[in-house]
Each structure stands twice: as structure tokens, then as C-alpha cells.
Amino acid sequence: MYAIVESGGKQFRVEPGKVFFTERVVGKGEGEEVKLDKVLMVKTDDGKVLVGKPYLENVEIKGTIVEHGRARKVIVGKFRPRKNYRRIKGHRQWYTAIKVEEIQVK
């Protein structure tokens, strides 16, 4: 069984027991339970496919926050030829790792 869920403006394929990385979830700490209710699609174990318009009302995904962290640094540079102008800036994006516990189809 797997589901397509929307979190942080992006879509993820999630399965029970697997961990996925999304934008930082504010207000929740490590070890706390989260419920993902923006479920776009579910494929059950018996091959049945449920598609939402845009979301499924009767599906709930429960997960646990594994960790909050920051991704690897992305280096961005600006350069102007012949003007002796160079700027380098780094950015590290916050993320939250969520382990999916179960997918409930009501």
C-alpha cells in the first residue's frame, strides 16, 4: 500500500514504515505524532486505486517526526566580468524527516 501526499507544497510517495523528508514542520518536536490529511491518491494492497479531487476525504496518514535538520549547503555565486565583483552566498534548507506509521482508509 502506498499513497501520494502533499506536504510543504511538494508531493511525496509514502509507504508504511518508510521515512520521507519534507519542508520543516513548525510547532512539532522530535518523536511527536503528525497527521497528514492532504492525500491525493492511495493504492491499496488489493490493487484498488483511490484518486481525490483534489484530496481524499476518507484517508488519514499517521506518522512520527524522526528529526529536524538542515540539508547540505548550496553555494550561489554572483559574478560581473571586468568589474572585480564577486559574491558567494551559501544556503542550508531546513527539513523534517517523518516516518509513516500507517495509512488508514475509512
Curated annotation (Swiss-Prot):
Transmembrane listed as a keyword: no
GO aspect biological process, one term: translation
Disulphide connectivity of cysteines: none
Entry keyword Glycosyltransferase: no
Keywords: Ribonucleoprotein, Ribosomal protein, RNA-binding, rRNA-binding
PANTHER family recorded: 50S RIBOSOMAL PROTEIN L21, LARGE RIBOSOMAL SUBUNIT PROTEIN BL21M
Assembly and interaction partners: Part of the 50S ribosomal subunit. Contacts protein L20.
HAMAP family: Ribosomal_bL21
Protein name: Large ribosomal subunit protein bL21
